[in-house]
Amino acid sequence: MNTLQTTRRAVVLLLTLLGIHASGLAQQARVSLLSELHKLSDLSRLPEYASGTVVRQTSSYDTTGNNDDGFSGKYSFVRRNPDSSLVIFEAPGNGVVNRIWTPTPNDELLDFYFGGSGKPAFSVKFSDLFSNKLFPFINPLCGNQLGGYYCYLPIPFKNGLRIVSRAKKMEFYQIQYRSFPKQTKVDNFSMQLKPEEQAAIKTLQGSWDLLRQHGNRPDANTKHLHMDTLLQPGQQVTLAEINSPGRINRMVLSPASAFSGNPKQLNIRITWDDEQIPAVYAPVADFFGYAFGSPSMQSLMLGAENDSLYLNFPMPFDRKAKIELIYRNAPNGHLPAQKIQMQLSYSATRRNPEREGKFYSYWNRAISTTPGKPHVFAAGKAKGHYVGTILQAQGLEPGMTLFFEGDDETHVDGQMTMHGTGSEDYFNGGWYAMLDRWDTKMSLPLHGALDYSLPFSRTGGYRLFLSDKLPFENSFFHAIEHGPENNNKRADYSSLAFYYADKPLSPGKAPDNAATTIYTPDTLMLYPQLMKYSVMGNIAIDGNTFTASGDGHLRISLQEIPPGNYQLYADLESNMEGAEVSLWQRQSLLKDQISFYWPKKEIKDRVFLVPLEVTGFKNTITFQFKPDPNRRKIWINRLIFVKR
């Protein structure tokens, strides 16, 4: 028996022994650590409504609308106690904390008070919620990557929960929780875990690996479909049509490379029960988490891996399901035929309309965001719950990705329930444009970064809401700002929202050529903090300051700059220690003398250096220092490449 089969049997056996299969769990009213862990391991229950519950969030966001979302600590607590400790979370009634996030953990203790008690039930260092040093706060539920520190370990509470930090100052944080009706029976979280709770945590990674690779566990009614098709431009093809009640458990499309590139010409359309509004209508690339035309996302529920696309969201329907691919003609030029394969698993298990919603998505491309208004992920009237977001974000103003300062905001049934502290924060990250923080693409089971490029001023992220799915009874609004204040940074946003509901929240727009073309800026910028360097000789690097001893060489990689012809500019500084340098491309001299000397300190923006050609072979520039013991420094704030 291989490792995969052994893991699958262990997970199934554990759930069987615990007696918490989906059919039984739906009938039990008690909320416990075990029941919440089961929501994270058995995702076949994701379509089930969470009626009567509300998900809210306490965060350090600036309530004045400005951008002090944790820097000063002014908004980073509910109240200060007489001993200067900080109440950072307080909720009445019954509930469960589903998510704790911060980019600024500290080593001070957090005290957890249950049910109005004057004595903490347990205390833990804030940093140990994420360090993987303290069980049960371990991977995959708790950890840190991409600049963010996250914990999804459920913390159920009855008759209220208060969390107090012994730190004198807190900075950025978010604590998300679900409140239950008063009559709900809840077992308080305890650090003394029962054997079955320990087992559930330890086997969770295995169950997630199985789900991502193989989809939800098949039942006796599972059937399989396979389709091969050669799709010509201008054609559409029905990949699957099921004319009886059931639910789709997994879909795989291949090759993933067929959906790459610019523009994104292939759309996917999924329709339930002949509804007028498609449940899914989006570019295939956007739906599966590509980043600006290239495969990127490998989440638990959908993504691209091994040149295949996978979709694991359970998708129940009442009478009929239809899945189509549409290959749009290009406005100019020839497109090749695409050979596509599809594998689908589904069962005849009927949807219970009283207890389950249908799966829907909403694709929203804003080629230019509206000043003063946020970008909407999803909005409308229905009953259901929100389960995921994908966002590609492209700045329209060259330079730093300041549009990603925008906060998320959620309104449920007419009331604001959540307000975030920044865009990478929403995706469980932190500190964009910082080395080894939010600076590259990375996929984790529940969240990740699709891309990060300072030269292109673009990024993107995704986040799944599983045990913390956001329920709504009548209406839902979920959006994100673009810019630190008043949505004041122009950007190009493309998003996918995923939710279950009794009907679509709102109709989307059909993806056409104009809305699926990827924006490519004509001005690109390199910043020192993420430049890639090579040096020859003795050169010290400190931020934007480069100091040479003798005739040092500083070579800067241009691999992030696309091939083409550019005018090269620089934002630089000069002063009395400024060196004289020459500029080279490989062995070709581009400019014999560039001076960083000036009698007093002066900042100079957009200084023209040289015309420059970048190719696959010529993708570096080198500054060669001219020896001078008194003038050994250059200061580069950024390099600017303007297409000719």
Residue ranges of each PLM-predicted region?
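Intrinsic-disorder-associated interaction segments
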Residues: 4-7, 30-36, 197, 561, ...
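Residue-level detector of intrinsically disordered/flexible regions characterized by low predicted structural confidence
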Residues: 4, 10, 68-69, 76, ...
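Bacterial Sec-dependent N-terminal signal peptides
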Residues: 1-28
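Short acidic/polar micro-motifs centered on Gly/Asp/Asn
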Residues: 4, 271-273, 627
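Short, functionally important structural connectors and interaction interfaces within domains
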Residues: 12, 462-464, 626
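Beta-strand-centric surfaces of beta-sandwich/beta-rich domains
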Residues: 27-525
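A generic structural signal for short, solvent-exposed coil/turn residues
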Residues: 18, 23, 92, 104, ...
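Extracytoplasmic
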Residues: 407-412, 417-423, 507-644
